[in-house]
Amino acid sequence: MKRVTIVVPCYNEAERLDTERFASFSDDRYDVRFLFVNDGSTDETQRVLEGLRNRASERVEVLCLPKNRGKAEAVRQGIVRAFSSECDYVGFWDADLATPLSTIPEFCDFLDSRLDIEAVIGSRVKLLGRQVERSTSRHYAGRVFATTAAFVLDIQVYDTQCGAKLFRATPEWARIFSAPFSTRWIFDIEIIARLRELRRGTSQPEAKDVIYEYPLMVWRDVEGSKVRLKDFVRSIADMARIWKRYGRGKGPKKIGDW
């Protein structure tokens, strides 16, 4: 059985965090360990997380950042911490559980069966027979964003921003997360850009051939999301920054070059 660590970034989630669902899942899945990162919350998030850790101490760890750093840095620090422990797969999951925890074993099974794939990322595609509940405005905003992201990455990816991703715990992925990202929110794009740059000019398969977009069976918009219209506008500017930094890569990066 593979060992899995899932990083869960949390900022002021005291009222929304469904500790019962996390605890119940932990009771059933001894192979999955959760690493919650409290990103400088100003509410009772730390108390709630400590309560969950006390209930499932062997499978729950809490990392507390002294001040708010943004989702990108919270996830990155959690991933770096996860790589310091023994695990086969490492990933991150949104705390609101828009993607249910039952999807984690599906991602693991897929990586088990496809040794050519290095990462599985959730994709919110509304298809018949699937329960993907996304507002119309978010859907169309997402399509604009995804089209822009595909241009920046030169990879036809459908959904970069779903908060459910799982990676093989390899030195290559450790390098990708070794330095802070240049944006606070759309770091998902930068993850793919870094992988693409590491493999550019090498004999390894290209990034587009080792990342699998997994169409989710269930996903739902959760009330209280912290992504606002101004964040969407800012993300377009951030995309330009990513393109400038990675869009004209000339070869594999050295550690620390990010």
Predicted regions, residues:
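Donor nucleotide-sugar binding loop of glycosyltransferases
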Residues: 13-16, 41, 71, 100
